[in-house]
From Swiss-Prot:
Protein name in the entry: Heat-labile enterotoxin A chain
Family according to the record: Belongs to the enterotoxin A family.
GO molecular function: toxin activity
Subunit (UniProt): Heterohexamer of one A chain and of five B chains.
Function of the molecule: The biological activity of the toxin is produced by the A chain, which activates intracellular adenyl cyclase.
Pfam family, one: Enterotoxin_a
Keywords: Disulfide bond, Enterotoxin, Plasmid, Signal, Toxin, Virulence
Signal peptide: 1-18
Residue ranges crossing the lipid bilayer per the database entry: none
Active site positions: E128
């Protein structure tokens, strides 16, 4: 037991526990299962395709979870942590029934929001240091993973051969300002009348009037989040196409020179 504790504290102090361009998620599912799923998808993603249930892409609802502490069945976000240490602590708490689980190392991207930065003093669990991924995390965005056996993190980082650095190398999580409109506080929540959210309140939220179509605060937040996600997905698709076109151009140039 002393050896396990010693190893644990060495890992806590090591550089692999903090990396500004990487995030971490503890998950019971092995890499091959994550790959078959297309990545780390939100629970609401499966509900949407299986039952047609609309995903709830409300950050405040996501951060609160359910009254029992579990993930919402219609959740449109995937939780990650800022550090390996935070992910490990989360794993030891929520995955304590598993002798083996994994901590996935994930590249940052603009569909991710620092929950504490966006929700401020109204963040329900600030100690979790959570960064939430709107719409999920593709398998190509997963840099690699650590195995955790009986609470001890394997020192070896298993690299994901399908990670695409060129798609994500220059991407960061979204600035807090981008997330204020998507915070998802209830319509009459006092945050909408306070800094900084008062300047970003969607129509129908706080003192803002409803939209011309009569959308409620929650509906407008859902619409704005959907638009934000689609813009991000389009950006990544353009990057993928651009890289593919560059490779084709290089191939054609080499072929012409031969």
């Amino acid at each position: 037991m002393k050896n396990i504790t010693f190893i644990f504290f060495i890992l806590l102090a090591s550089p692999l526990y903090a990396n500004g361009d990487k995030l971490y998620r503890a998950d019971s599912r092995p890499p091959d299962e994550i790959k078959r799923s297309g990545g780390l998808m939100p629970r609401g993603h499966n509900e949407y395709f299986d039952r047609g249930t609309q995903m709830n892409i409300n950050l405040y609802d996501h951060a609160r979870g359910t009254q029992t502490g579990f993930v919402r069945y219609d959740d449109g976000y995937v939780s990650t942590s800022l550090s390996l240490r935070s992910a490990h602590l989360a794993g030891q708490s929520i995955l304590s029934g598993y002798s083996t689980y994994y901590i996935y190392v994930i590249a940052t991207a603009p569909n991710m929001f620092n929950v504490n930065d966006v929700l401020g003093v109204y963040s329900p669990h600030p100690y979790e240091q959570e960064v939430s991924a709107l719409g999920g995390i593709p398998y190509s965005q997963i840099y690699g993973w650590y195995r955790v056996n009986f609470g001890v993190i394997d020192e070896r980082l298993h690299r994901n051969r399908e990670y695409r650095d060129r798609y994500y190398r220059n991407l960061n999580i979204a600035p807090a300002e981008d997330g204020y409109r998507l915070a998802g506080f209830p319509p009459d929540h006092q945050a909408w009348r306070e800094e900084p959210w008062i300047h970003h309140a969607p129509q129908g939220c706080g003192n803002s009037s409803r939209t011309i179509t009569g959308d409620t605060c929650n509906e407008e937040t859902q619409n704005l989040s959907t638009i934000y996600l689609r813009k991000y997905q389009s950006k990544v698709k353009r990057q993928i196409f651009s890289d593919y076109q560059s490779e084709v151009d290089i191939y054609n140039r080499i072929r012409n020179e031969l």
